């Protein structure tokens, strides 16, 4: 929905208008586990606030912004369309990123991936441990707020690590297909780990849902 509305060229303007006219509002996805299911690695208070407040705010603000964008399209107001781009990117990215993040985690997670994903990690990073070190370093090294990502470069057929600032969506800003995202905004860890981001990164590996990451990897290879 977001990409068609925002990124369409002039030749796609008429279809986009029709699409927006019948669009459905975004909604907050349910978590596939209880708020306390990831303890002791991520506590219930963090998960509840993160999901029901922070993610919900991105969803609500995205819906409001899309309504304003729809009005601007209908009026042919290009200035207003341009002015709304930052809000679309921020709130749309926040919704996309968190929707991936929740499924990337599991109370039954941790350990190592298996099969083709593990082989691809070894091929592109040397070993699973080297991969963990590189993604951890990229995530810890984000200045301010942002995300660390494992993505897939479809053109090269390779896994790549990237860091995105704020809520910039990985695919929309780098072209990489997102497989695993690590939220390093302070709201993701501060209530439990204070300002020690490396401790949060160390803990989150215990709840990574490798089945979900593998499913994403296999899907983007098709």
UniProtKB/Swiss-Prot annotation:
Belongs to the iron/manganese superoxide dismutase family. The modification N6-acetyllysine is found at residues 68, 75, 114, 122, 130, 202. It catalyses: 2 superoxide + 2 H(+) = H2O2 + O2. This is Superoxide dismutase [Mn], mitochondrial. Binds 1 Mn(2+) ion per subunit. Its cofactor is Mn(2+). Residues 1-24 form a transit peptide. It is an enzyme of class 1 (oxidoreductase). It comes from Macaca nemestrina (Pig-tailed macaque). It comes from the Eukaryota.
């Amino acid at each position: 929905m977001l990409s068609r509305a925002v990124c369409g060229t002039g030749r796609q303007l008429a279809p986009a208008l029709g699409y927006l006219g019948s669009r459905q509002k975004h909604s907050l996805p349910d978590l596939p586990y209880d708020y306390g299911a990831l303890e002791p690695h991520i506590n219930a208070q963090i998960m509840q606030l993160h999901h029901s407040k922070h993610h919900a705010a991105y969803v609500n603000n995205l819906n409001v912004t899309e309504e304003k964008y729809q009005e601007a399209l209908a009026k042919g107001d290009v200035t207003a369309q341009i002015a709304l781009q930052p809000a679309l990117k921020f709130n749309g990215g926040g919704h996309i990123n968190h929707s991936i993040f929740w499924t990337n985690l599991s109370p039954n997670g941790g350990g190592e991936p298996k099969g083709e994903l593990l082989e691809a990690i070894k091929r592109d990073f040397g070993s699973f441990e080297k991969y963990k070190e590189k993604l951890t370093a990229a995530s810890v090294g984000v200045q301010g707020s942002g995300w660390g990502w494992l993505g897939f470069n479809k053109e090269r057929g390779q896994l790549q690590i990237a860091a995105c600032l704020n809520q910039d969506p990985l695919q929309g800003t780098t072209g990489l297909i997102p497989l695993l995202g690590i939220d390093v905004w302070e709201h993701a860890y501060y209530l439990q780990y204070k300002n020690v981001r490396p401790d949060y990164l160390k803990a989150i590996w215990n709840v990574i849902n490798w089945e979900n990451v593998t499913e994403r990897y296999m899907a983007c290879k098709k």
